Amino acid sequence: MEYAEVMTELESLGKERTKKMYLSNGAVEPLFGVTTGSMKPMRKAIKINQDLAEELYASGNYDAMYFAGVIADANAMTEADYDRWMDQAYCFMLADWVVAVTLSEANIAQEVADKWIASGEELRMSAGWSTYCWLLGRLKDDKFDEDKLSAMLEQVKETIQDQPERTKHSMNNFVYTVGLSYIPLSEKALVVAEEIGELVIEREHKKPQTLNAYASIQKEIERDRIGFKRKYVRC
């Protein structure tokens, strides 16, 4: 499929209800309102196509940008490419669910994510922490440096309260994900989560959201899900 065909298909798959939901979460026009599940047939037909992904991402259409992440060749993209995509990621859904997800399948994932975490920019920091969440939820524990992750937990504990709202959300999710998916530090994550306590995240045009990583990890313990790993992160 070529660019025009994909855009026509995405438009036909759009739903007004989904569009309203995306708009309420920070997406802006142009967009069609396509659910991720509706994209799967096209994903199977196209598989991986980096050139097409670049065309779609550059369109500025939210649904096209999302689908670009689905068909992107994660390891063909350089650090500069990921930075360019982040420059265009205008909302958390693109930063955390498109760019971070794609980066998490690249060999340079941790290297790039570390720089984003240190950037001081809300969505870049959020995407950096989110990249680690996607990595931890998929890769075996021996693919990570335990000391590094331990230091990152300490960083979250000491700095989370002073971060921008979306960064705060992703840092909290990092603690939860370590607790759920990284057995060597699961107990430490629980302790850190308890020290952090409840977080109230302010959201534009929405009621504040209350997060509690400690309670969430405890629920996973009760469900005997500690050590959970997923096979895929992209739809």
Residue ranges and their predicted role:
Residues M1-C235:
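Alpha-helical scaffold domains
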